[in-house]
């Protein structure tokens, strides 16, 4: 494998990205990383007409034997719960996230039955799965690493990940807000804190920029427009941009598109365009910026005809060249 591969698995409304890069020091000569894992809800995969499938099914069908690195960009059900299911089959050697490595040890399982709406239920399950994912990683001999803006981490020969967010202040705020939630004993106040943390979680996302020779890939998790403050414009420049927050109206604007100036944009919106993902205005401004648009699923929009597929694979050269291909099956 002379080039890097970045595959966006069709997990419906969610995100799951498989990164593969040549590394002679690894078994099989390939470094593998899974960035988020989509949802673990069975209902997400009842209709598979667009090609969607749980990430662990995709990985198994690909014949993968291990995952060197897993990245949890933030604790929302459509990102972390599928990651846990993948970790049950492929316990990672390393897990990246934002909280201190041992932070999960001070947390306890939360009662999902107290939820008063679907959003609270999803978030409670995500928080519980965060604890389980950390515990599973460590019990299988893996390590947990906390990342903050300013770090650059080598991944394999020629490839590194630069952390653009969260800032030290935001990472500390996430830690404090999480601690306050778990310490709350009043039921009403607990639910208020739960919803507040849920609402803030997107902009606690890890924002990663993968640097591979001249190619730069910007992966902002669910960050919306309010989450890029403090990041220098030149740091956002990228040839491939996974638009934040599933391409909803707050996922990008012209100012952000002008800073990134991508040749290609990937939108991780579901075929049913839940929560108004793949918003037409967002897609229009990204296309107007000169970018080619690609989708992890098949959102139904006028003049958009994305074929059913299990995944979208980019082959990326060190010179910044991109080759995209929809894979009909794993």
Give residue spans per PLM region.
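Divalent metal-coordination and catalytic microenvironments
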Residues: 10, 19, 36, 74, ...
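Active-site environment of divalent metal-dependent phosphoester hydrolases
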Residues: 13-15, 41-42, 75-80, 102-105, ...
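Acidic/histidine-rich helix-loop elements
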Residues: 37-50, 178-185, 190-193, 248, ...
């Amino acid at each position: 494998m002379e080039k890097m591969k970045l595959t966006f698995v069709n997990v419906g409304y969610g995100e799951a990205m498989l990164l593969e890069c040549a590394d002679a020091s690894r078994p099989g000569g390939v470094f593998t990383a899974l960035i988020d894992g989509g949802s673990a809800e069975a209902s997400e995969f009842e209709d598979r007409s667009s090609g969607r499938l749980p990430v662990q099914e995709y990985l198994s069908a690909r014949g993968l034997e291990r995952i060197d690195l897993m990245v949890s960009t933030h604790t929302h059900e459509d990102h972390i719960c599928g990651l846990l299911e993948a970790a049950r089959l492929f316990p990672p050697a390393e897990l990246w996230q934002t909280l201190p490595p041992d932070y999960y040890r001070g947390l306890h399982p939360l009662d999902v039955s107290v939820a008063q709406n679907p959003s609270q239920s999803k978030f409670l399950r995500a928080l519980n799965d965060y604890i389980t994912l950390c515990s599973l990683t460590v019990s299988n001999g893996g390590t947990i690493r906390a990342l903050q803006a300013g770090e650059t981490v080598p991944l394999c020969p020629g490839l590194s990940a630069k952390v653009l967010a969260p800032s030290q202040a935001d990472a500390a705020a996430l830690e404090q807000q999480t601690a306050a939630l778990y310490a709350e004993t009043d039921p009403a106040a607990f639910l208020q804190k739960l919803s507040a943390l849920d609402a803030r979680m997107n902009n606690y996302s890890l924002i990663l920029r993968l640097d591979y020779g001249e190619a730069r890939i910007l992966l902002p998790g669910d960050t919306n427009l309010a989450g890029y403050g403090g990041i220098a414009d030149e740091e956002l420049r990228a040839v491939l941009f996974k638009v934040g927050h599933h391409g909803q109206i707050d996922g990008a604007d012209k100012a952000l598109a002008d800073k990134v100036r991508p040749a290609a944009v990937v939108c991780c919106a579901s075929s049913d365009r839940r929560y108004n993902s793949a918003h037409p205005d967002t897609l229009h401004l990204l296309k107007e910026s000169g970018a080619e648009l690609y989708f992890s699923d098949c959102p139904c929009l006028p003049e958009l005809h994305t074929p059913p597929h299990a995944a979208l694979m980019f082959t990326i050269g060190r010179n910044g060249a991109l080759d995209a291909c929809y894979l009909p099956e794993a």
